Amino acid sequence: MPEYDLIIRDGMVIDGTRMPRFRADIGIKNGRIAKIGRLRAGDAAKSVDASGQIVAPGFVDLHTHYDAQLFWDPYCSISSWHGVTSIVIGNCGFGFAPVRP
């Protein structure tokens, strides 16, 4: 049985720690990163070739104006196109959207 569900192979990893980028494989198990490093070919049920690609964690956009946009674009599509996986809303001192306390 494979050790990982998925291996992202040979990507250029930028991990957000200010460490220089590095080439590595990423082993995913149960939806979580289990290992970063050089992994054996048969260690996963599936693999994705990330050669020539940058692999990074999801970005957090700390300044958005999505308070109202959530009503007509519930997926905040433009953010996900750029690797953003989390957003902060209402941080400008006001919000457009009605909310419950």
Question: What role is predicted for each listed range?
Answer:
Residues 1-58:
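Histidine-rich, glycine-flanked metal-binding segment
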Residues 15, 67, 94-98:
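Flexible loop/turn segments at secondary-structure boundaries
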Residues 16, 29, 65, 89-90:
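Acidic/polar N-terminal loop/beta-strand segments that form early-domain functional surfaces
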Residues 17, 37, 68-70, 88:
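Activation segment
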Residues 55-78:
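Di-metal (Zn2+ and/or Mg2+/Mn2+) metal-binding site signature of metallo-dependent hydrolases
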Residues 72-101:
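Divalent-metal coordination cores built from histidine and acidic residues
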